[in-house]
Amino acid sequence: SQRQKTAKRFRYSKTETGRSDMKIFIPETEERASVFLSGEDARHLFAHRPQPGDEVFCGDGQKNNYKSKIEKITKDGIYILIEEKIPFSPPKAEITLYAALLKGDKNKFVIQKSTELGVSKIVFFESENCVMKLDKKKKNGKKERFEKIARQAAMQCGRDTLPEIGDFTD
């Protein structure tokens, strides 16, 4: 039907540089290696309706980027084959954003937008007028959640590096 043709045609696109817009982060690996993705990374790729043979752009978030292809799709996840390492271009400037803790989901918005804009490090602090106050137990949980949000935002915008979420300061 026409709807299926349209859905298939817009499965994913390539950028001006020829890179696939399907970007995922994987551990550092070697060329010609097969990597199994499950969980959130697999769900991110499933959203693009991948097919075996589709190109995927991978990175380790630190210093390596990889050109790869989808080998096999199973109900448990996706197997991708790393074809080659791609030269990594470091950012021209290291930008650190210091932001006061905000209430609600506003911190999530700050992390997403600053990641998309290329910020290298995000440090949240508690100011005198902050409504949100965190005890030591909550700080670790929040930092993990913020790192997860930054990773998702970096995958969404196709960024090469992951921003560092600094320790909470007073």
Where are the predicted features?
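Short intrinsically disordered, low-complexity segments
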Residues: F10-R11, K72, A154, G158
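N-terminal positively charged helical leader segments and presequences
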Residues: Y12-F88, K139
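RNA substrate-binding interface of SAM-dependent RNA methyltransferases
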Residues: F88-D170
